[in-house]
Amino acid sequence: MRLAPQKPLLLSTVLHLLLSIWMLGFASLAGATVQEPLAASDTPKPVSAALFSSIERLSRLVDITYCVGNTGVWKPFACASRCNEFPTLTLERTWRTGILMSDSCGLIAVDHGTPRHDAGEGKDDPLAEKAIIVAFRGTYSLTNTIIDLSTIPQEYVPYPSPDDGGNEPPREPSHRCDNCTVHSGFLASWRHARKVVLPELKVLRQKYPEYPIRLVGHSLGGAVAMLAALEMRVSLGWRDTVVTTFGEPRVGNRQLCDYLNAVFELNLGDEMDPAEREYRRVTHADDPVPLLPPAEWGYSSHGGEFFISKKDLPPSVEDVLVCHGDHDENCIARGKSSAVSVPAGDYDDALSTLEEQDVMLADALPWIPARLKLWELFFAHRDYFWRLGLCVPGGDPANWGRKGGEGAAESISAEG
């Protein structure tokens, strides 16, 4: 069954995005203790040309995941979008656990580093390298997920919960996650995906033991990739897991972010070559999602950020900056460096700071100023080297409302 989303649905998503942005303005009103995150050490510098190319390639790869549940991705590695740009990949499987916001969608592929026999002469990918790739798709309504879906944080443990057949970690973890909380909706999405992803990866790791694991995700998929990476590294001991996310929302509290920084050694600062980072969190100018859910709900950002400073497409090497710390004020944080630390169980106290603002929000909506340019904010979350989210050849022939192009919001379709 194919469903064509209607214009009001997309408008509703934009309005939810506005509400989320509006909530960011109340971070300073929270009554919880403010804990300083890792600070920026100096002015960000551009990435190297090689790192730029590597991240750009992954943005095209994660764009392909939007074909899953739409027109499809099929073996050996074909789709209606950019699959022909990856002649060295073979598809292992796709998954789609359902249509609810807590469900997950994506693909697992193997990059053999050399073109497939069916790729044809002249087909090559100079950036290809041997790897097992797991790509997590985003959602067309991430803001709905953030606001409406189980936003109450829950306790986080870095190994499978009893619900997932776990009880104790398989070994004494080298890092502890004390008093960590996680967005329960994002965790539910990973729990749905892990039933498919982990068994497949265990088989592939036996088949290709020398291939590292590369996780990539956009939007909600970035949040799921983060939780997947922590479990793979800590619980399963897969140290060769490297992560790249685009427009990743905040997933947990300050303690969880500190934990991730330690696991992926993001707290080394300038001691680490940016190209050697094993967690790359890519953000884009004016994209509000990396700052959501807001800090007054007990959420924070972690390190590893690379910031696309140019608003319009396409960016150049000089536009992609290496950020420092968790909240580099030269990057997506833009001065919003305070992170509210809300211990497990104290969510209601933090949320109570918002209750008095409900009437103010209702009164403010009729006077939304046109200068906010809501469509530009919506597109900013899609614009990561390319405009992501359309399963069409070349990614975005209609430009989706960019300067000089016609909007094509009505053309999205998805399978139910």
From Swiss-Prot:
Family classification: Belongs to the AB hydrolase superfamily. Lipase family.
Keywords associated with the record: Carbohydrate metabolism, Disulfide bond, Glycoprotein, Hydrolase, Lipid degradation, Lipid metabolism, Polysaccharide degradation, Secreted, Serine esterase, Signal, Xylan degradation
Catalysed reactions, as listed in the record: Deacetylation of xylans and xylo-oligosaccharides; a triacylglycerol + H2O = a diacylglycerol + a fatty acid + H(+)
Protein name per the record: Lipase A
Class of the enzyme per the UniProt entry, highest EC level: hydrolase
Dependence of activity on temperature: Optimum temperature is 40 degrees Celsius. Thermostable from 20 to 50 degrees Celsius.
Record's signal peptide: 1-32
Disulfide bond positions: C67-C391, C177-C180
Entries under PANTHER family matching the protein: FUNGAL LIPASE-LIKE DOMAIN-CONTAINING PROTEIN-RELATED, TRIACYLGLYCEROL LIPASE, PUTATIVE (AFU_ORTHOLOGUE AFUA_6G06510)-RELATED
Record carries keyword Nucleus: no
Organism: Sodiomyces alcalophilus (Acremonium alcalophilum)
Activity across pH: Optimum pH is 8.0.
Subcellular location: Secreted
Post-translational modification: Glycosylated.
